[in-house]
UniProtKB/Swiss-Prot annotation:
Ribosomal protein recorded as keyword: yes
Gene3D superfamilies assigned: 3.30.230.10
Family named by the database record: Belongs to the universal ribosomal protein uS9 family.
Compositionally biased tracts (Basic residues): 114-133
Gene Ontology annotations of biological process type: translation
Domain of life from the UniProt record: Bacteria
Annotated gene: rpsI
GO MF, any single term: RNA binding
Cellular component GO terms held in the UniProt record: cytosolic small ribosomal subunit
PANTHER family reported for this sequence: RIBOSOMAL PROTEIN S9 (PTHR21569), SMALL RIBOSOMAL SUBUNIT PROTEIN US9M (PTHR21569:SF1)
NCBIfam families membership: PRK00132.1
Identification of the protein by name: Small ribosomal subunit protein uS9
Region annotated Disordered, chain positions: 97-133
Keywords recorded for this protein, A-Z: Ribonucleoprotein, Ribosomal protein
Length: 133
C-alpha cells in the first residue's frame, strides 16, 4: 500500500444552529458544498466573498480544494459557520497567519443563540398584554 501524500486540514465552524465541516487540501481551486458547486449552493456574490475571505488572505485561492459539508440553520448562519471553519483550516496550514485572521475577526465564534421561550409569555421576552384595572 502506498501512503497518501495529500495533506488535508479539517475544521469545524458553528453559528446559531448551523454547523459546517471544512476540508482544505492542496489542489486546483475546486470547491464542493454538499455535492454542489459554491455558485449553486450560495448564489449571492456577497456570501461567496464572505466565505472565501480567509482563503484570500493566503494569496492564491486556486491552489486549494475545498470540500464543505454544512447543515442546519439559515443561509447566513451557514455562511458564517463555513467562514469560521475555513479560517480554522487555514490556521492549521499556516500558523503564522493567526494574528491576521484574528484581527479580521475570522477566528471569533459568535456565541449568540436563540433565547428559549419562557412559560407565561408569548415569546422569549414578549409578554401578554397587561391591564392594571
Amino acid at each position: 500500500m502506498t501512503k497518501n501524500t495529500i495533506q488535508e486540514s479539517v475544521a469545524t465552524g458553528r453559528r446559531k444552529q448551523a454547523v459546517s465541516s471544512v476540508r482544505l487540501r492542496s489542489g486546483n481551486g475546486k470547491i464542493d458544498v454538499n455535492g454542489k458547486t459554491l455558485e449553486q449552493y450560495f448564489p449571492l456574490e456577497v456570501q461567496r466573498a464572505t466565505i472565501l475571505a480567509p482563503l484570500k488572505m493566503l494569496g492564491d485561492v486556486n491552489s486549494f480544494d475545498l470540500i464543505i459539508r454544512v447543515s442546519g440553520g439559515g443561509v447566513q448562519g451557514q455562511v458564517i459557520a463555513t467562514r469560521l471553519g475555513l479560517a480554522r483550516a487555514v490556521l492549521q496550514e499556516k500558523e503564522d497567519m493567526k494574528q491576521e485572521l484574528k484581527s479580521q475577526g475570522f477566528l471569533t465564534r459568535d456565541p449568540r443563540k436563540k433565547e428559549r421561550k419562557k412559560y407565561g409569555r408569548k415569546k422569549a421576552r414578549k409578554s401578554f398584554q397587561f391591564s392594571k384595572r
